[in-house]
Amino acid sequence: MIYTDFYGEKLSLLGFGTMRLPLVPGGGPADIDEKTTADMVRYAMDHGVNYFDTAYPYHGGMSERVIGRALKDYDRQSFYLATKYPGHQISDSRFHFASEWTTCASACTSGMSKLTGRS
């Protein structure tokens, strides 16, 4: 694996995106096949991928939860997580900055809670 220095952190150039995870046959967009996803995460980690990217709206909000569970058995210092604030989807431009900041903070806290399984 090739790595890059990102502000002193060693990140794999290849990341694991979670916008399109495998689904359970016949299921809906939030019905992620957790076993197959865990196998994919294990394969990625075994081959040096250490950067995982997810976001609030992926798979109806389930992407963060499933990736969090797939990574729970790995040393937390061995990988990097990115989740994103979907401001364009949950913001209202009529709100002032304080409301936007509160919404952003809430979305980030929610994402990290789903990724870690902790509230």
Language-model features and meaning:
Residues 51, 82, 119:
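Generic enzyme active-site microenvironment
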